C-alpha cells in the first residue's frame, strides 16, 4: 500500500534503465496489483504483450474484511482497497494473459470483476520437488540414500515435538502455516480443544511461522499467535499440543510430514480460504493423508 504513490516514478526510471541497456522485453509479466500497474505501463510503452498473475485479489479481500466487521473507511485508510480494485480492473482490461493456480481462482476471484472476460486465462498449478518430499517409508528401505542433513532434521524435529507431548507415540495432527487470520489456526485449536475423544486419540502440532519474541512481531501476527496460546490454555492442551517456535523449510518441514505419516496421523489445512495449498501437495507426497478447507485451491487438488 505504501508503494502506490511511487509507482509512476518507478515506471519512468525502469524505462530509462531498459533503454540504456539497449535490450527490450519480449513481454512483461506483473505479479500483484502494484507490479501489475507497472507492467501495463511498460507493456504499452514498449508495445509488448502483458501477462498478469494476481495471487490475491482486492474484491475478495474487501469481502473478507467486511465479514470481519471492518468499515470501508478503515479499509481504504489501511489498504487503499478501492484504489487497488480500480487498478485491478485496469489490469484485467489490458492483460493479454492471466495466469492462475486453479480454476476456482478464475471463477471465485477474477469472476468478481467487471473486466473478467477480457483476458485469456492459463491455469498453471504449482508443483513440488519429489526428491525432497518423498514417502516416509523410503527411509526404511535404504537409509544410505539420504543425506546427513535429512537424518539430522528427522531427529531434531522428533526431539522438538517430544518435549511438548506427554504421550509422543499417538498419531500426530500436523498444521503448518504462517500466523495469518485467514489460516484459521484458532479454529483448529478450538475444534481439537472441544473434542476430548480426539485428544485421547491424537496429538496436535501447530507450526505457525517463525518467531523469537511475539511482542516484537507485526500486530496481525501477534494477534493470531496470542489467540492460539489463549485457546491452548483455555482447553488445557498442555502435553497434547506442540507449538514450536522455528523450523527450516529445506530439511525440517519434509521431515515433519514424514514423522506425522509414520505415526498414522494427518496434515490439516483449516484455512478459511486457500488460493492453492502447496503444503497439501507436499504432505501427500510423503504419504501423509490430508484434510483441507472446502474453499479455493484444495478443491482442484
Please report, for each region that a protein language model flagged, where it lies by residue.
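Catalytic cores of nucleotide-sugar-dependent glycosyltransferases that transfer UDP/GDP/TDP-activated
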Residues: 1-301
